[in-house]
UniProtKB/Swiss-Prot annotation:
Pfam families: SKA1. Keywords: Coiled coil. It comes from the Eukaryota. GO terms for molecular function: microtubule binding. This is SKA complex subunit 1 homolog. Residues 48-75 form a coiled coil.
């Protein structure tokens, strides 16, 4: 389309030049009646015509360059569209929300760690020794050897394989963001299990003891887990949406559930 416009402009310019040349020819005929006085005028006309010819040639060269550049521009546009398509496909499998696990850990835990570290230096050495003996008797051996919780995200194919009734209004981004939350809950519990009593406040120590009782059960040994009461967001909460997400993840083999005492325990599972 740009080539057509340039060609149309060139035709208009040539027509204008032809009209001007015709007028100049008429002037030449009129001035031939006085040859001696028209020589300077003819020289000026020749110079003007030469300048016009150069301008026309310059326009033609520019038009040719633009025409030759069109195929290259088309190839570049096609390559850009292909790359855009690849990036869009990749973005489908990536969750839109990647929360920092460190910020997801219980804020009370972090605050109490700092407070209790300061108090350690004020405690009597004999009392510290007794507390370490008490801790050694309480801590289970299972607290060692755990790595970071796994992040087994679901794919769009897995989500589409679910019935519309089970899937509801859930999206790939919501479910994978919930998987991030579950890993954060499990990591926070692992910190509580591994922390010493001196670094925990009384309320957190009670939860740590409860988790250490749970971790000795055969169903959760060596696995990452969290409690139903840990579900406090930002993406996975104990509401209807959260329960629907758990149902989907349980169906897709990402979690299993068990009840230990009065606690409903959700265990992170590797998909088959």
């Amino acid at each position: 389309m740009e080539g057509n416009q340039a060609g149309s402009s060139l035709d208009s310019l040539i027509a204008s030049f032809n009209k001007r040349i015709g007028e100049l020819q008429e002037l030449v005929i009129a001035r031939n009646m006085y040859p001696a006085s028209t020589i300077p005028d003819l020289s000026a006309i020749d110079t003007a015509l030469s300048s016009m010819e150069l301008q026309v040639q310059s326009i033609k060269d520019r038009l040719r360059e633009e025409t030759e550049a069109i195929p290259k521009a088309k190839k570049l546009i096609e390559a850009s569209l292909k790359q855009q398509g690849k990036l869009q496909k990749m973005s489908i499998y990536a969750p839109s929300h990647f929360p920092d696990k460190a910020t997801m850990l219980n804020s009370d835990l972090n605050r109490c760690l700092l407070q209790e570290n300061a108090k350690q230096y004020e405690q009597h050495s004999t009392l510290s020794s007794l507390k370490f003996d008490e801790e050694a008797a309480v801590l289970p051996k299972e607290k060692k050897g755990r790595g970071s919780p796994p992040l087994w995200y679901i794919t769009v194919e897995e989500l589409n394989s679910l019935s519309s009734y089970m899937r509801g209004r859930l999206t790939l981004e919501k479910v994978n963001a919930a998987i991030n939350d579950m890993a954060s809950y499990a990591e926070a519990n692992a910190h509580l299990i591994a922390a010493s009593k001196q670094k925990l406040a009384e309320n957190l120590w009670e939860k740590a003891l409860k988790l250490r009782d749970i971790v000795t059960e055969q169903a959760v040994k060596g696995k990452h887990f969290f409690l139903e009461t840990d579900m406090k967001g930002p993406s996975l909460k104990l509401d209807n949406t959260g329960k629907a997400i758990l149902t989907v993840l349980r169906h897709l083999g990402r979690i299993s559930e068990t009840r230990i005492g009065q606690n409903r325990v959700i265990i992170l599972m590797k998909p088959h």
